[in-house]
Amino acid sequence: KGLHWRSRLNLAISENKKAGLRAHKSNTVIEIDKCMIALNEINKSDIFTKNWDNENLKISCSSTNEINVSQFEKSILGPDKLTENVDKNTYTISPKSFWQSHINAPGLLLQQVMKEANIQQDEIVCDLYGGVGLFTLPVSKLIGKNGQVHLIEMNDTCIEDANNMFEHIENIYIHHGTVEQKLGGVKNIDTIILDPPRNGVSKQVINHMIEKKPNTIIYVSCNPSTLARDSKVLLENKYSLSNIVGLDLFLSLIHI
């Protein structure tokens, strides 16, 4: 337990051109021949035995065991796109796009969000801070041709991936920009799913959500303190808290 779960790694390169990790609060690179929290597929590769130029490596391993190595946001080894299978959904994403680092996290999050949201036919759903559309794709299958799911994301690479994957799905609408900029333009929202960064959502976004009066809000958070702060505002505006579920997606770390 707590080992061999991480699918994304940032590695440093030593003076001997070997991959390793930086010592705590130091620029010193400690060479390693394996990483105990990395997926076994990463440790079985030649990443820790090869010689590398430059200073850093980003390693990404998909659920289909594809491995990409990137430097300075450019792929230098492996496929340029990774295939991720989550339940019955398939995603094709760039290693630069955000994806959960725990290999099982996308599936656990998806199952819990879909359970709590209880999406129905013909609903209008917003997926805020939606990344490449982890929640958008399964929602689109539940709402039918008369429903709508609106993915709002500001990251260019995530939006490019989402456009490539969903361009032929007629009930998915992709909005490139901040939630502050785009949420106001979506009408008659039934359900909001949001997965913001650790600092939570802005007052403007909270106010937009309250003004839209969705029946259901599913808040995915990696920071209990900002979740509590934002939930307090919603509770003060006629919403009630029906359920809280904790998922340990960062094993051996303080985060939840």
Question: Where in the sequence are the language-model features?
Answer:
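Accessory RNA-recognition modules of RNA-modification enzymes
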Residues: 1-194, 199-205, 213
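Conserved beta-strand signature within the Rossmann-like core of class I S-adenosyl-L-methionine
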Residues: 216-222, 227
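A short, acidic, flexible beta-alpha connecting loop/helix-capping segment that sits on the rim
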Residues: 224, 248-251
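Short alpha-helix
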Residues: 230-234
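Conserved active-site and SAM-binding loop architecture
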Residues: 237
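Conserved S-adenosyl-L-methionine
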Residues: 241-249
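Conserved small/polar residues in nucleotide/adenosyl-binding loops
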Residues: 254-256
